[in-house]
């Protein structure tokens, strides 16, 4: 009982609302109490926020409360299927097929989230690979695709359903033999073509890019959308080299790619980002922004998932956006926010059971970590692929934050540390080096619901200052990341 009372008192100190500051009312999940929750950010504009997710049209509006709760910047809001909109060449555009996508864009925009759309699937009359929706258009029909993209960008250049971010195809580095149409993959890869078809993709990109920009000067074109195979990236690398060999690096505003799960001691997001950056650097495109438009922890195609999968997924969710920020990604989208199980390899953060939405621990890990990371700038050493011997060692990411998330630290500038161990059976003791006597707040159990009526079932936030002035804050670190804010 004494521990329970102590924790409640600490929580009251840490989360007392700041008087005089209010926010516009936003939809929220039914049954959640109305309260001002961390972080409370004021002052200069926050640094770029890479956090986002995929949210499709069929999920009911109750999901919007979960969207606004995490304060994301981005969402992948659906697909534009050229094959459905122009089934007959020259027969006009059937924009009505986008009604549900438009409705999704509107509700996301009203929630303050920037939508992106994926353009894919060639009509039967335009397919380079006959009978395959994933096919690129034939050379003689690229002009039709250019006209379509110009009309599309113009249609959605303004209004309450405005879309400015366009991703061109989805995973085109798959070949037709590898990509069933029902999977939503592209299939531009062709070993008989230069650079496995990447040069052709680049030439198409060079033609549609100016048309999109002319139709909407605010448009942002995401090129690539690469699956980027790993560890054997020979085809994907050739495909990307082909894109860049045509000069199409200047016909996209950002390069997008997908990265799921871990590889060795590192997350594949780190491996792939560093590999892609090296390739871009070799082409003089050092500052080309990167978007990871699909990330997640999945349990693969085998069912059922392992018994501990939800905890493993939560561990990943609590660190992956810190890694995305440390990597300098423009965007990182979890695929997907909500769907019926198993969805895509059980990757979702929220289970949708006939309209009943049940957040997983990974959703709360996403929410709590994203809020703690709001307004941060990475100040640690450059990210690198971890060696195998780091698998059971504590990893630390360091961020600067102009204002603490916690009223207990009086909104002072802080250094935020994110600590975890990639794989470990027992917690690893780690002494975090801080200035002697530094004030600090520790955040643990980020996979818990911050709105749970029982404070013991909420994330744990408590003072963990260096009270003995030895310049160390001891932490027992395991797979679920711990966050520590230290006054500078």
Go through the PLM ranges and name each one.
Residues 386-439:
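Carbohydrate-binding surface patches
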Residues 8-19:
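Bacterial N-terminal signal peptides
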Residues 433-455:
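Solvent-exposed beta-hairpin/edge-strand motifs
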């Amino acid at each position: 009982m004494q521990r329970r009372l102590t924790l409640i008192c600490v929580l009251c100190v840490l989360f007392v609302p700041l008087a005089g500051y209010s926010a516009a009312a936003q939809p929220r999940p039914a049954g959640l109490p109305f309260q001002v929750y961390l972080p409370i950010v004021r002052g200069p504009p926050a640094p770029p926020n890479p956090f986002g997710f995929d949210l499709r049209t069929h999920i009911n509006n109750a999901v919007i409360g979960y969207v606004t709760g995490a304060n994301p910047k981005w969402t992948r809001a659906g697909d534009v299927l050229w094959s459905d909109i122009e089934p007959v060449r020259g027969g006009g555009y059937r924009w009505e097929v986008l009604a549900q996508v438009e409705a999704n864009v509107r509700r996301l925009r009203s929630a303050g989230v920037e939508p992106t759309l994926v353009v894919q699937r060639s009509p039967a009359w335009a397919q380079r690979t006959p009978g395959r929706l994933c096919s690129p258009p034939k050379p003689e029909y690229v002009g039709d695709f250019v006209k379509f993209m110009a009309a599309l960008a113009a249609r959605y250049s303004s209004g309450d359903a405005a879309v400015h971010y366009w991703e061109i195809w989805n995973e085109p580095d798959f070949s037709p033999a590898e990509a069933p149409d029902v999977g939503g993959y592209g299939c531009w890869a062709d070993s008989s073509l230069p650079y496995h078809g990447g040069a052709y993709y680049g030439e198409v990109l060079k033609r549609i890019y100016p048309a999109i920009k002319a139709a909407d000067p605010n448009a942002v074109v995401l090129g690539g959308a690469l699956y980027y195979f790993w560890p054997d990236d020979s085809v994907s690398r050739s495909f990307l080299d082909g894109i860049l060999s045509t000069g199409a690096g200047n016909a996209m505003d950002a390069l997008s790619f997908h990265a799921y799960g871990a590889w060795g001691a590192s997350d594949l997001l780190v491996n792939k980002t560093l590999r892609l950056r090296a390739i871009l650097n070799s082409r003089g495109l050092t500052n080309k922004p990167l978007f990871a438009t699909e990330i997640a922890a999945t349990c693969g195609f085998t069912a059922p998932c392992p018994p501990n999968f939800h905890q493993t997924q939560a561990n990943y969710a609590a660190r992956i956006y810190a890694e995305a920020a440390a990597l300098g990604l423009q965007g990182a989208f979890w695929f997907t926010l909500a769907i019926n199980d198993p969805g895509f390899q059980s990757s979702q953060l929220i289970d949708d059971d006939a309209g009943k939405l049940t957040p997983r621990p990974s959703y709360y890990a996403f929410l709590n970590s994203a809020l703690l990371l709001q307004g941060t700038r990475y100040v640690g050493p450059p990210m690198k692929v971890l060696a195998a011997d780091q698998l059971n060692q504590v990893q630390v990411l360091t961020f600067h934050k102009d204002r603490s998330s916690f009223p207990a630290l009086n909104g002072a500038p802080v250094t935020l540390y994110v600590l975890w161990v990639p794989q470990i059976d027992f917690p690893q003791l780690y002494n975090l080096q801080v200035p002697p006597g530094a004030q600090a707040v520790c955040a643990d159990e980020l996979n818990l619901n911050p709105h749970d009526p029982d404070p013991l079932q909420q994330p744990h936030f408590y003072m963990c200052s260096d009270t003995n002035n030895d310049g160390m804050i001891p932490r027992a670190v395991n797979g679920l990341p711990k966050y520590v804010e230290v006054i500078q």
